[in-house]
């Protein structure tokens, strides 16, 4: 993402051929993560808009273009980290905010609607990672101001 939108860039298959550049969506896009959160076969895009700014949205492909279908409603200052994957087999976006509530939260699509849950507050996540193991999943969070790395363990 950039101040001019979100672009999909593909390198050439053969050396010397042209790169392919396609504009995916407009807007000031700071960070993105993709997953098919609603299991319709098409990946949705979670964005931080603009770079380290105060909006987190989910966009869905509708009639050939990505349209905003979800906005994180909590007041945000310095949205900083996104990751997507599956948490105990369910598609998920996980996001972190560095100021105000400094929360770590996730969004899932359950029974036809987006469900948001705050995992922790006051932690200022700078980087996130999701690891799937056989009997549990791990959410890793590098919490900036606290100078700590935290592992949240999610089991059935």
Show which residues each predicted segment covers.
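Beta-propeller-forming repeat regions
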Residues: 1-156
């Amino acid at each position: 993402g950039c101040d001019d939108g979100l672009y999909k860039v593909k390198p050439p298959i053969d050396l010397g051929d042209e790169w392919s550049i396609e504009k995916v969506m407009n807007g000031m896009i700071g960070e993105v993560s993709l997953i098919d959160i609603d299991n319709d076969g098409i990946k949705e895009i979670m964005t931080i808009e603009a770079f380290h700014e105060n909006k987190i949205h989910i966009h869905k492909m509708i009639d050939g273009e990505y349209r905003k279908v979800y906005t994180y409603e909590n007041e945000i200052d310095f949205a900083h980290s996104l990751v997507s994957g599956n948490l105990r087999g369910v598609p998920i976006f996980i996001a972190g905010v560095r100021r105000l509530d400094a929360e770590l939260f996730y969004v899932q699509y359950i029974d036809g609607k987006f469900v948001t849950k705050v995992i922790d507050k006051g932690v200022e996540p700078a980087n996130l990672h999701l690891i799937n193991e056989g009997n549990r999943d791990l959410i890793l969070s590098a919490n900036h101001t606290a100078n700590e790395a935290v592992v949240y363990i999610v089991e059935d």
